[in-house]
Amino acid sequence: MENFADSTKVAWQTDDGKTTFCVPIASVIHGFIYNTAIFDELKLTPPTTVAEFHAVLDKIKADGKYTALDIGTADQWESATMGFQNIGPTYWQGEDGRKALIAGTAKFTDAPYIDTWKELASWAPYMGDGYQAQKYPDSQNLFTLGKAAIYPAGSWDIPTFEKQADLKFAAFPPPVVKAGDQCYISDQLDHGIGLNPKSPNLDAAKTFLTWVASPSFAAVYANALPGFFPLSNAKIDVKDPVAKQFLSWRQTCKATIRNSYQILNRGTPNLENELWGVSAQVMNGALAPDAAGKQLQADLDKWYHPAK
């Protein structure tokens, strides 16, 4: 376990951090995937600021041939996962903001969260016709067919798109609000493996987990499943070009995990599920950003006392 930084163990630890019960394996990173052929055709460059992002979206929309922003709200979870949790860390400053929510010193009614929903609401004019009925597979198909320019993504989408030989794509990280601002990424702890202490195969399982924790496993895993990134501190040569782009953001951006996962997902109403519905409603124009913050904070206050 010496191959893993403390931050990579959080998803598989007791709250006091004293007991780790899984070997961390991999994370997924959020960002935006774009069709490079469309960008070349329209003479666009990947945006680095929110203003540049909207300028690019305006140009794609004005051209009229492609859906500018390929995301739907029918399934709801995409609105939270590839929307709110993708761009939000830029506004609430990653781990600082996430930990402040847990401590109760920040609320969903604060400006960083309202500003995140305001930005999500501004996406609507760039999304496809009927996006309210568009499901996750619909979004994937639209991008795969070359009919959409920008796809709010998780790195787990890379293998799906790479099955299409004719599709050329790349990625850019969530744009910052102002040029020169610190960039943030959601580098979500995704999976680990634990050992049942009552297993009849303890020795064999320990041998396997020792390998799972090794640099050699990390190297195999990173290239066998592009878009799922090893959590060990081993230096890995990721060969997939788009996965390599996503991974490179760890060097320039500060990483965080989704703010609805650690501790705050334990009560009722469930914060993760509430975020789905609230974010989808904001993107549908059915809920104002201020109202979204009030609703989410009120739901959290029903069971999470530090938030009061």
What are these regions (language model features)?
Residues 1-7, 37-48, 142, 149-150, ...:
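Extracytoplasmic "Venus flytrap"/periplasmic binding protein-like
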Residues 24, 101, 186, 229-231, ...:
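C-terminal capping/gating helix-and-loop segments adjacent to ligand/active sites or protein-protein/ligand interfaces
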Residues 1-4, 89-115, 163-164, 176-184, ...:
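Short, solvent-exposed loop/beta-turn-alpha elements that line the ligand-binding surface or hinge
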Residues 145, 156-160, 174, 191-269, ...:
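Mature extracytoplasmic/periplasmic domains
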